[in-house]
Amino acid sequence: DRFYLEVQRTNRVNDEEHLHAAVALAERSGPEDLVFLYLTSHGSHDHELSIDQPRLQLADLPADELAALLQPLRDRYKVVVISACYSGGFIPPLKDDKTLVMTAARADRVSFGCSEENDFTYFGRALFAEALNETDDLARAFELAKTRVAEREQADDFEPSEPQLWAPKPVLEHWKKLRRQQAEEALSAATKAQ
């Protein structure tokens, strides 16, 4: 089963409702699961994600508050992908042995492609639309995406964003195990359907 954490913020993440949502996800998931969180937004020099919405005044989400929000999931394997300027600054507060973190840029660099007209940022397209369609190895997919982002930025004459990766071996191994299980289940289902 898949469970989703939806957080609608009007206050800081220590708000009881938001922590309750993270706790609920922790309770519904087990050690066999992997929580995959994709965040895309504008990022700031102060390592905060903009979550502002039209007609709503929402506080930005600082890196340390995202880490606090994920604390109820500290015993779960997690992949956190952040596509935003300065997103490399999210790695230090998020990194641990059960959390893989991919970011679209170094802590001191902007990333590109964030606009209403685009389906993806440069990094999002390179990772999700391209690299993960070529390999299900997360570390390899990141390297492919990083190379493609660099090529596109060079072609556009932009300063390199230099995507970052924190990839603990236990998370990579758990991901591979889950992907093998999914492949086996798909093969079994296809065989039964014939």
Predicted regions and their residues:
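Active-site-proximal C-terminal subdomain of hydrolase catalytic domains
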Residues: V79-L172
